[in-house]
Amino acid sequence: MAKITKTFQYGKHTVTLETGEIARQAGGAVIVKFDDTVLLVTAVAAKSAREGQDFFPLTVDYQEKFYAGGRIPGGFFKREGRATEKETLISRLIDRPIRPLFPEDYKNEVQIIATVMSMNPDIDGDIAALIGASAALSLAGTPFNGPIAAAKVGYKNGEYILNPTVTDLKDSQLELVVAGTANAVLMVESEAELLSEEVMLGAVTFGHREMQKVINIINELAVEAGTKPSDWVAPAKNDGMIAALKEAVGDQLASAFQVRDKLQRRDAISAIKKDVLGALAPRATIEGWAAGDLAKEFGELEYQTMRGSVLSTKVRIDGRALDTVRPISAKAGVLPRTHGSALFTRGETQAIVITTLGTARDGQVIDAVSGEYKENFLFHYNFPPYSVGECGRFGAPKRREIGHGRLAKRGVLAVMPSLEEFPYTIRVVSEITESNGSSSMASVCGSSLALMDAGVPIKAPVAGIAMGLVKEGNDFVVLSDILGDEDHLGDMDFKVAGTAEGVSALQMDIKIEGITEEIMKQALQQAKAGRLHILGEMAHALTTPRQELSDYAPRLLTIKIHPDKIREVIGKGGSTIQAITKETGTQIDIQDDGTIIIASVNAIAAQAAKSRIEQITSDVEPGRIYEGKVAKIMDFGAFVTILPGKDGLVHVSQISSERVEKVGDKLKEGDLVRVKVLEVDKQGRIRLSIKAVEEGEGVPASAE
C-alpha cells in the first residue's frame, strides 16, 4: 500500500495522519503528528476468538518513550519500566470510548498500542493517541462502529479554547476531554475551577461539534487505503433456548429485584439461576445448548427485568425514587494518631479516608519525558476485595484504582491551597471498606472531610455523586446516586463532583447512542440537587477546616535568609545543618532563593532550630557585645566563638587592662566570656576585646 497522508488544522495545531509506510504488518497503523508531538498507533485484531472466551479482550497500552523528549531514563536499568500513572490514565482514556463500539458478541482479542516517539512538552499525547487509535481501528477492518474523534477543551475569559497547550491550561478554568462518534458523545473526562453546569455542558457540545472534521478525515483515510469491511458475523440467537429460559424464569427475577439488600438480592438471583439452569439441564443436553450460552442469556434477562421495572414503575431496585440519595453518615476524626481522617457512608458504599501532612521533601518526584518535576498533592484509592464480600488478588493498584483515585483527586483539586499558602506535601488515601456503586464519589466526600479534619485550608467542602440512565426508545429515566447493579445494567455512568458554588470534576461514560443534550442537561441539574443534599449531610460532621493541626502533624516554620548565607547554614560537607537537625530533632529544607522550612512535631524544637539558623546567618556588628566560648588558646591571644561558625581573635593586649604575660593564665578553652567586637575587616576576620567590656564599652548584641 502506498503512503497516504492527511493534513488539517485542529485548533492551533497542524495535524497529520499518515499510513502505509510504517508498521505495515499491523492490522492498522497510523503516524499521528500534532506539530512536533508524533505518535505511532497500531491496532491488531485476532482472526478468531479463543475457545471458551466469554468476554471481549480489548487491551490498550499508551507509552511515552524517553527518547521522545531527548532524555535517558533514570534508574539502574536505563530503560522504560512499568506504565506510569499518566500512561495508565491515558490508556483508560482511549479504552473507554472505544469499548462500547464493538458488537456485544465480538470476542476476538484486540490490542491497541500508542507509542509517543517525539514530544513537544507543550503538546500532550492524549488527544493524538485517541485519534490515532480510532484511525488504526478503522484501517484494521474490525467490526468497530466508529470512527470516533476526541477534543480537549479549555475555558478562559468566557471563551472555549480548542485543544489548548500545556501552557494554555495553566491559566484555564477548565480541562475537558470529550470523545464521540459523528452522532453521539461517548466519553467526557474533566477538571474545572468550580464552573456552572451550563458552562460544562457547553464545553461538551463545543468539543463534539469541533471534532466532526477529524471523523471525516478518518473516514477519507480508510476509503483511500481500501480498507475492507469486517467479515465477522454475530452468532445467531437460539430462539428456542431463549423461549425455554424465559418460561423457566417466569416472574422470579422480577420478585428477586424487589429484595432491597444488595447481598440478599445477589443470593436470590444466584439461587434462581442455579435452579433454572438445573431444571433446563436435561433439555440442554438433548438440544446441545452450551452452559455458557444459557448463563449469558440469563444475564440478558436480568438486564431487561431491571430496566423494564425502573422504566415502568419509576421505582428503583432498592426502593428509592429516581432522584433520592441513599442515607448518609459522615464522621470526622475517627482515627486517633492520623493527621486527619473521616468515615463516609452512603447506603452500602463506605470509605475511610485519611490525610497525612509532610514536608516539601516528602513530595513525589516524577521522572517524565518532558522533564523531572515534584508532585506535592497525592491521592491514592484502594479497593480491597472484601469491600464487595469477595476473595481476590491483593497488592499493587490495578488500572481501575489508579483511574478512580485520579477522578477523586480532580474532585478536590479546585479547592486545595497552593504550596505557598500551605507549604505541606499532602497525601490522601481512600480505603473503600464497602462498595455498592459510586465509591469514587464517596472518596471525594470523605477526602473533603479528612482534609478539613487535618486543618488543610480548603476553600469549601466538596461532594460527589454518580448519576445513571436507563433509556429505551424515547422513554428514559435519570437516576441519582446509582447502585452497582444500576451502573452495570444502565446506559450511562455520569459522575459529578463540586462545591455549592460549582463543578470541580465531571466524568461521563455512555454505552449507547442517542443521548441528547437535553438528557445531559437533566442529569447535570439532578446531580446538582443531589450534590447540595450531600453537602448538607456532610455539614453535620464538619463545615470548615480545623484551626489547629493534629498533635502528631509536623509544624512548619518558614524563615528567609540571603541566598549568600545558604553555605553558612549548610556548613562544610553539610556538617552545620546535620548538627542542627540531629540536636533539635527537626527536618530542614533549604531552597535556592533562601527560603528555609523547618518541620517538627515539637514546636519548641522547631523554634530552637530557627534560633540556631538565625544566629548562624546574623551579621556580626562592630561595637556590639557578645557572649562567647573560648575555642582555642594561642601564644598571641585566644579565639572565641561568638556565633555558630563565627570565631574572632582576642589579642593578648585585649584580654585585660593589666599586662598579660601568658594567655593560659587568664583563659582556658571552654571558658564563657563577654567580648566586644572591635572590627570586622574586608576578609571577614573579627577582632574582639574582653578588656573593652570590663571598661564598660559596647552595647549587648541582644539590644535593638
From Swiss-Prot:
User: Which GO molecular function entries does the Swiss-Prot or TrEMBL record give?
Assistant: 3'-5'-RNA exonuclease activity; magnesium ion binding; polyribonucleotide nucleotidyltransferase activity; RNA binding
| Location(s), subcellular | Cytoplasm
Which cofactors are reported in the record for this sequence? Mg(2+)
Primary localisation category = cytoplasm
Q: Which UniProt keywords apply?
A: Cytoplasm, Magnesium, Metal-binding, Nucleotidyltransferase, RNA-binding, Transferase
Q: Entry's SMART domains?
A: KH, S1
| Function (record text) | Involved in mRNA degradation. Catalyzes the phosphorolysis of single-stranded polyribonucleotides processively in the 3'- to 5'-direction.
Protein name stated in the entry: Polyribonucleotide nucleotidyltransferase
Q: What is the lineage of its organism?
A: Bacteria, Pseudomonadati, Pseudomonadota, Gammaproteobacteria, Lysobacterales
